[in-house]
């Protein structure tokens, strides 16, 4: 099973659709509860979406580079990975400043920025580290992250308290070393330290992709994906007793749990679509094969919709007032 997998395109597309829905609800005052992220510790269905996309980033790296093994010019490949990651990062910055272009209030982190870092580091890991070490790298990194977040004293504060946003090492690093503005006044969910475990989410995708392109029997490969996923879910539950499931911190338990679910979902979609030939996900496939473009287009259109830079009044206000005038209340 080599090359482009329809199941991965579909899964990426479905994930992207939910990312757009979650990020652009229309009104933050009237959002269906499952489409909101957990305030801090805890989990909602929405908290699964972004890590699944990062997982697919890892899978896609393997599917793309595996076809060229033996033909790869490593230096050229490195340059391409760096250049693409840089472009994704710049687009993320553009979405933040558009359409006001207020460079005094720029946010250097964000969804696309995190995707760019995950793509960059996972690409390098795939090129320079033996595949058999991927899981060791993941587990060791997540245990070190767990230790840092639970046991390393915060300068000027003391022992961390993971029950609140302001009393952890990730907050301390972002507050003191992250330039620009943060998503929240005191912390950023795509901050510096939390990017490390998010990269491991991408490495889990590298592991899944490596399994998918191996020469083993397809049934054995899908079962292996499922069982790895199941084990990771149990490991995540174990760590949650000391380091709660928390998307904002990309906690160790959260990384294991979401990675495990992505392993199992990848196995299920591969079986359903690539093995059984289920073909009723055409729209998701279109989104999945043009994911970054679609995400950026949605961001630009929404920014214009809520901006008064063009005609002096928000298009959203015109739309909402028109609905109200016709007796339809947008709640």
Model-derived segments and spans:
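Alpha-helical transmembrane segments and their immediate juxtamembrane cytosolic regions
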Residues: 1-331
